Amino acid sequence: TSIDPEGKPNMIAVGWLMRANMEPPVFAIGINNKSRSGENIAAGGEFAIAVPGVELAQQVMYCGTHSGGEVDKFAETGLTAVAGKVVKAPLVEECLVNVECKVVKTQEIGDHRVFFGEVVASWVSEREGKPLLIVGQEEGYELVYEEKGFRLGTVKD
């Protein structure tokens, strides 16, 4: 998630996410240069990673196929923005995990920017659930939802 300079929150479905460092803990996310979320993160220097469960597949797909410049994704999906402990970017109450990050480096590559965010706080829900992933055609994943050429799934049991 991110927040724009006027305080409007936004969500994005990110397929390019990885742990980039152990100590200090850093995540890297790759976001298209044309993305509103990328603009927000570049301007604000922070973001939050929200890990949804499989029950949120349709909401995640909506966030990945609509622009935050045109719609309020929280209002349209019915998801709940909650304040984090450190960053202004909102957490998502319904998600299994939320991680607050401060940008420590940005790297432009091709049509994407990679933001490296140091973890400054994290939250794990007490609810049990299977995390939702953006998947391709690889073996080992259970397809949960597919739309507009995008596939969401989870690791097979």
Model-based region annotation:
Residues 1-157:
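Basic, polyanion-binding surface patches
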